[in-house]
């Protein structure tokens, strides 16, 4: 195989149980987001926009829709050997050594595919999660990794100390070399000189290739290990004196974007997913989908334009402060602060507010929907209300989140 300088390895096998029912039939990275994308698209765009084109995507849980999406729409062609995005399903590649086991953790997923790393002989390996919403110039992080002569560089997100108990926290010295790793500590340690701020690990890593091999081979031999980067591999690296540095995500430069890079969301719960979706419909969104210098590629399905029809009395087709994909028809209804995916239809006299409607949802006449996430292929009968009577919504079998968001599963029939 052809040699590359930086090899990308994306961990996309997550079950995403806290996103159920959106993950009932798909992996977490395959969950739709932002009217036309899937969650995996954002990290893939980060690699491609950073000029890193040799990428493996490691899959495991309910990967069919994710596989189809990447195989169909993320293709470089056949003429550049160092330009590829290839799927790597869990396949018991080390069966003779480990026995009949699938990926046992994030570190084990990479360990079981070290032969791919060896084949490309990269200078550095970028191990990133496939389930976050963010923009990142990964090349800038790689250069920082080289400049510090690090064995491992961890992307870090500064957070208020009071919020840091939810994350793995990195303790650094004056040069941002990591001295300690705390997994969801009760009393997080702040950044030197910034007593109100702690460094949260984003779970994205750059490894010197030799260090990656050494650490993963040692971890595989450890029968007490959970084979997880955050819980096992990084603490081992610190104990054994490896040079481990933190990279300040806020200082990551994005072409066409002014100021610090502030937006990173782990959409690992239904409420977090909903909140991130609502971020997109603000007049000045925290996460900008419209930056031409940082294009966000995804499936090009050649949908027709969105369409708004009828303007008679109360029968007015309109959408306000919303994101609408191609093929949407708002036929005499009103859409406010919502995200509508492809081929959604909102019929006359209906109101959709602060909701996310996936592909091929149809809202009948005189419906009222608010604070809802409705998965694909749901036909809502006329005069239906969703999000107004939560006990009724629960009785229908819908999921109601702690924040009161109603989630209608894929293909639900009324």
From Swiss-Prot:
Give the pathway.
Glycan biosynthesis; glycogen biosynthesis
Keywords (alphabetical) are: ATP-binding, Carbohydrate metabolism, Glycogen biosynthesis, Glycogen metabolism, Nucleotide-binding, Nucleotidyltransferase, Transferase
Q: What class of enzyme is it?
A: transferase
- One GO process term, biological-process aspect: glycogen biosynthetic process
Disulfide pairs here are: none
Which reactions are catalysed by this chain?
alpha-D-glucose 1-phosphate + ATP + H(+) = ADP-alpha-D-glucose + diphosphate
Mind telling me which residue stretches traverse the membrane in this protein? none
Keyword Nucleotide-binding found: yes
Q: Which residues bind alpha-D-glucose 1-phosphate?
A: 103, 168, 183-184, 201
- List the CDD domains hit by this protein, alphabetically: ADP_Glucose_PP, LbH_G1P_AT_C
What top-level branch of life does the organism fall under?
Bacteria
Q: Which SUPFAM superfamilies match?
A: Nucleotide-diphospho-sugar transferases, Trimeric LpxA-like enzymes
Q: What is its EC number?
A: 2.7.7.27
The answer on whether this UniProt entry bears the keyword Endoplasmic reticulum reads no
Q: Which GO terms describe its molecular function?
A: ATP binding; glucose-1-phosphate adenylyltransferase activity
* InterPro entries listed in its UniProt record: ADP-Glc_PPase, ADP_Glu_pyroP_CS, GlgC_bac, GlmU/GlgC-like_hexapep, NTP_transferase_dom, Nucleotide-diphossugar_trans, Trimer_LpxA-like_sf
Family to which this protein belongs? Belongs to the bacterial/plant glucose-1-phosphate adenylyltransferase family.
Subunit relationships: Homotetramer.
Q: What does this protein do?
A: Involved in the biosynthesis of ADP-glucose, a building block required for the elongation reactions to produce glycogen. Catalyzes the reaction between ATP and alpha-D-glucose 1-phosphate (G1P) to produce pyrophosphate and ADP-Glc.
Official protein name in the record: Glucose-1-phosphate adenylyltransferase
**Provenance organism:** Thermus thermophilus (strain ATCC BAA-163 / DSM 7039 / HB27)
The gene that this protein is the product of is: glgC
């Amino acid at each position: 195989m052809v040699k590359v300088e930086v090899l990308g390895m994306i961990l996309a096998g997550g079950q995403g149980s806290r996103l159920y029912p959106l993950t009932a039939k798909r992996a977490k990275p395959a969950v739709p987001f932002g009217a036309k994308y899937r969650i995996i698209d954002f990290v893939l765009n980060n690699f491609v926009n950073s000029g890193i084109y040799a990428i493996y995507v490691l899959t495991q849980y309910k990967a069919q829709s994710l596989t189809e999406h990447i195989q169909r729409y993320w293709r470089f062609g056949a003429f550049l050997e160092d330009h590829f995005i290839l799927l790597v399903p869990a396949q018991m590649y080390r069966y003779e050594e480990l026995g009949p086991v699938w990926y046992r953790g994030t570190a084990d997923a990479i360990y079981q595919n070290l032969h791919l790393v060896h084949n490309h002989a990269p200078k550095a390996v970028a191990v990133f999660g496939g389930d976050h919403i963010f923009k990142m110039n990964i090349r800038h992080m790689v250069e920082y990794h080289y400049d510090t002569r690090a064995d491992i560089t961890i992307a870090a997100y500064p957070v208020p100390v009071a919020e840091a108990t939810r994350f793995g926290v990195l303790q650094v010295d004056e040069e941002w070399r990591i001295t300690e790793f705390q997994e969801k500590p009760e009393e997080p340690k702040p950044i030197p000189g910034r007593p109100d701020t702690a460094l949260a690990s984003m779970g994205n890593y750059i490894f010197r290739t030799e260090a990656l091999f050494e650490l993963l081979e040692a971890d595989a031999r450890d029968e007490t290990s959970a084979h997880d980067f955050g819980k096992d591999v990084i603490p081992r690296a610190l104990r054994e004196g490896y040079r481990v540095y933190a990279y300040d995500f806020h200082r990551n430069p994005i072409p066409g974007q002014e100021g610090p890079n502030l937006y990173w969301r782990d959409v690992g719960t239904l409420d977090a997913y909903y909140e991130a979706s609502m971020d997109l419909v603000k007049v000045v969104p925290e996460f900008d989908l419209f930056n031409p210098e940082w294009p966000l590629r995804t499936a090009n399905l050649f949908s027709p334009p969105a369409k708004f029809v009828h303007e008679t009395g109360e029968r007015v087709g309109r959408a306000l402060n919303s994101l609408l994909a191609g093929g949407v028809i708002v036929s005499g209804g009103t859409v406010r602060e919502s995200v509508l995916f492809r081929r959604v239809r909102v019929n006359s006299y209906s109101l959709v507010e602060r909701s996310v409607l996936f592909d091929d949802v149809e809202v009948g006449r005189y419906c009222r929907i608010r604070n809802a996430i409705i998965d694909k292929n749901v036909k809502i009968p006329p005069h239906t209300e969703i999000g107004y009577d939560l006990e009724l919504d629960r009785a229908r079998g819908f999921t109601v989140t702690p924040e009161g968001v109603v989630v209608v599963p894929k293909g639900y029939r009324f």
